[in-house]
């Protein structure tokens, strides 16, 4: 066993003595040592209950004959970090999470690992660490929050953000706003729609590294604790069989994950995270795969923020394995990839049942004929940009409008809420990329303001920043290269016409080639003052969003 290096032999007497200080017995020294990575804390609603999930994992490890050891990592709630300096630290936390786990699991040679994340950057950060370490592993998340209820309908955090815009224009009164604030988030779990956290936890199922139901079983259901026990038992079996993450996760696994993402209409952040995770697994993954597959995979699940359903409804309808059954029915699922169950994913999916034909529609009756995400290219995005196609209003699928340029998200939000943005405008928010922010903040407030102000059918937004999984509308993020790296988004001027064609996947600045070249030649990127030692280092090492916003390798 990998842990024998601290347990066996004369030279390891001091090591055993220290382990006995923890209460470890001689019998336990002969068993697999299982590390459990916990991101429990008391400030993230999606993580406040993870101590109970971790206890269930520990029970499962012991049931299977292993010895559990819990160690922590950090986490940030993007919702609470939104609209202030804290959002600059959200995406950078992903790298710290992966690094910290790699450090602990290398300093202590565990035989296996169970990863217990839940929210936006924590799940991908843990998956990156899993790929790097390549130790037998299982991921079990904390699960989604239940939707809130107000006035006879389900609501969630995005309802709150959009209600703020509605209040500004008199569509929502103060009493209603307060009621929505009080009721939208009823308890523990990751926010209730198909936002980034729930998308990533769902894609972990499709990758084969998490138990069935990982992405959809609500946080407060007892089934979540049973799944956590199962995760603890599964990892011990993987250790005994010496099955490692790279034996499970292949390019075909990523293709399954992308297809699930497109079929469900997942978060745009998945493009960023899947690219980074693939790099950690040593897999060559081109983001163009999203666009190639989106032409084949229809959008079949209409889940918040683009539809009326929530994750609990998807769970009731059969969950992610039922979505994969639709792929299987149409001959698209990559069936031969392995899973943590030591069974092929195709065999497991055959056992799945689709329990609601409206929540998970057949391919011949989709919500949209193409997948939920698209990659756009053009003279404004030579390395690509990302759009949530399932959230684009029909009349905005092709749009030409004048640019209104902002150098950060706060400026843009103030302008939108004060009525300075008019129908037809294209809001351009730049210097919000990985390097320029630094930290590639989410632009949830400006997009929610556009929706709340009743402009979603008439205003587009493009940015080198990114979006919350809750953003929707004619919005395009991850524009690469970013302005801080000399990208063309940096040369846009107020009043320039911008053409967006979601159908053709193009994003272009409508100026002459000569003018374009002149501006690019004369362009000097703005350099922002950075008041954080870590963010200065992050900005120095981070790469483009098109490369997953991972660090440059020495």
From Swiss-Prot:
Cysteine-cysteine disulfides: none
Cofactors named for this entry: [2Fe-2S] cluster; Mg(2+)
EC annotation from Swiss-Prot or TrEMBL: 4.2.1.9
Catalytic activity: (2R)-2,3-dihydroxy-3-methylbutanoate = 3-methyl-2-oxobutanoate + H2O; (2R,3R)-2,3-dihydroxy-3-methylpentanoate = (S)-3-methyl-2-oxopentanoate + H2O
Cofactor binding remark: Binds 1 [2Fe-2S] cluster per subunit. This cluster acts as a Lewis acid cofactor.
Top enzyme category: lyase
Annotated GO biological process: isoleucine biosynthetic process; L-valine biosynthetic process
Keywords annotated in UniProt: 2Fe-2S, Amino-acid biosynthesis, Branched-chain amino acid biosynthesis, Iron, Iron-sulfur, Lyase, Magnesium, Metal-binding
Binding site for [2Fe-2S] cluster: 119, 191
Pathway in which this enzyme or protein is active: Amino-acid biosynthesis; L-isoleucine biosynthesis; L-isoleucine from 2-oxobutanoate: step 3/4; Amino-acid biosynthesis; L-valine biosynthesis; L-valine from pyruvate: step 3/4
Binding site for Mg(2+): 78, 120-121, 442
An example molecular function term from Gene Ontology annotations: magnesium ion binding
SUPFAM superfamilies reported for this sequence: IlvD/EDD N-terminal domain-like, LeuD/IlvD-like
Pfam families: ILV_EDD_C (PF24877), ILVD_EDD_N (PF00920)
Residue positions where N6-carboxylysine is found in the record: 121
Active-site residues per Swiss-Prot or TrEMBL entry: 468 (proton acceptor)
InterPro entries: Dihydro-acid_dehy_C (IPR042096), DihydroxyA_deHydtase (IPR004404), DiOHA_6PGluconate_deHydtase_CS (IPR020558), ILV_EDD_C (IPR056740), ILV_EDD_N (IPR000581), IlvD/EDD_N (IPR037237)
Any one of the GO CC terms: cytosol
Family to which this protein belongs: Belongs to the IlvD/Edd family.
Subunit-structure text: Homodimer.
Function: Functions in the biosynthesis of branched-chain amino acids. Catalyzes the dehydration of (2R,3R)-2,3-dihydroxy-3-methylpentanoate (2,3-dihydroxy-3-methylvalerate) into 2-oxo-3-methylpentanoate (2-oxo-3-methylvalerate) and of (2R)-2,3-dihydroxy-3-methylbutanoate (2,3-dihydroxyisovalerate) into 2-oxo-3-methylbutanoate (2-oxoisovalerate), the penultimate precursor to L-isoleucine and L-valine, respectively.
Protein name: Dihydroxy-acid dehydratase
Protein species of origin: Thermotoga maritima (strain ATCC 43589 / DSM 3109 / JCM 10099 / NBRC 100826 / MSB8)
């Amino acid at each position: 066993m990998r842990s024998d290096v601290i347990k066996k032999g004369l030279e390891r007497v001091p090591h055993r003595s220290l382990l006995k200080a923890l209460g470890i017995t001689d019998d336990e020294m002969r068993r697999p040592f299982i590390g459990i990575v916990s991101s429990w804390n008391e400030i993230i609603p999606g993580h406040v209950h993870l101590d109970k999930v971790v206890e269930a994992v520990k029970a499962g490890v012991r049931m299977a004959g292993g010895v559990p050891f819990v160690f922590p990592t950090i986490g940030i709630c993007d919702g609470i970090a939104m609209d202030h300096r804290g959002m600059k630290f959200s995406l950078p936390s992903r790298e710290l999470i992966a690094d910290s786990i790699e450090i602990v699991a290398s300093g202590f040679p565990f035989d296996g690992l169970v990863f217990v994340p839940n929210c936006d950057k924590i799940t991908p950060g843990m998956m990156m660490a899993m790929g790097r370490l390549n130790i037998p592993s299982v991921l079990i998340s904390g699960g989604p929050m239940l939707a809130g209820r107000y006035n006879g309908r389900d609501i969630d955090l995005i309802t709150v953000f959009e209600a703020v815009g509605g209040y500004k224009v008199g569509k929502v009164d103060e009493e209603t706003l307060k009621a929505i604030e009080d009721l939208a988030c009823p308890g523990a779990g990751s926010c209730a729609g198909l936002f980034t956290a729930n998308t990533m936890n769902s894609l972990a199922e499709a990758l084969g590294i998490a138990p069935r139901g990982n992405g959809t079983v609500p946080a407060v259901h007892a089934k979540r604790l049973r799944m956590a026990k199962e995760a603890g038992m599964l990892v011990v079996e993987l250790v005994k069989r010496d099955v490692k993450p790279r034996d499970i996760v292949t390019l075909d696994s990523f293709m399954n994950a992308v297809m699930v993402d497109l079929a469900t209409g997942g978060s745009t952040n998945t493009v960023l995270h899947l690219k980074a995770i693939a790099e950690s697994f040593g897999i060559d993954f081109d983001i163009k795969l999203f666009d190639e597959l989106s032409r084949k995979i229809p959008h079949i699940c209409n889940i918040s923020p683009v539809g009326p359903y929530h994750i609990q409804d998807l769970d009731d309808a059969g969950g992610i394995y039922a979505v994969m059954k639709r792929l299987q029915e149409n001959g698209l699922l990559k069936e031969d990839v392995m899973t943590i169950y030591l069974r092929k994913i195709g065999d497991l999916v055959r056992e799945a049942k689709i329990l609601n034909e409206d929540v998970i529609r057949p391919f011949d009756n989709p919500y949209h004929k193409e997948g939920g995400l698209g990659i756009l290219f053009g003279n404004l995005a030579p390395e690509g940009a990302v759009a949530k196609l399932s959230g684009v209003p029909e009349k905005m699928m092709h749009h030409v409008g004048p640019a209104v340029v902002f150098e950060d998200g706060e400026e843009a939000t103030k302008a939108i809420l004060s009525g300075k943005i008019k129908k037809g405008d294209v809001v351009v928010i730049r210097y919000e990329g990985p390097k320029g922010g630094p930290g590639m903040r989410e632009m949830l407030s400006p997009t929610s303001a556009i929706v709340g102000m009743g402009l979603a059918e008439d205003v587009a937004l493009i940015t080198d920043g990114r979006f919350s999984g809750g953003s929707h509308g004619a919005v395009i993020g991850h524009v690469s290269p970013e302005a801080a790296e000399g990208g063309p988004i940096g040369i846009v001027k107020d009043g320039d016409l911008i053409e967006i064609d979601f159908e053709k996947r193009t994003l272009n600045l409508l100026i002459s080639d000569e003018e374009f070249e002149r501006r690019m030649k004369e362009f000097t990127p703005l350099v922002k003052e950075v008041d954080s030692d870590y963010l200065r280092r992050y900005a120095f090492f981070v790469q483009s969003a098109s490369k997953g916003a991972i660090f440059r390798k020495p």
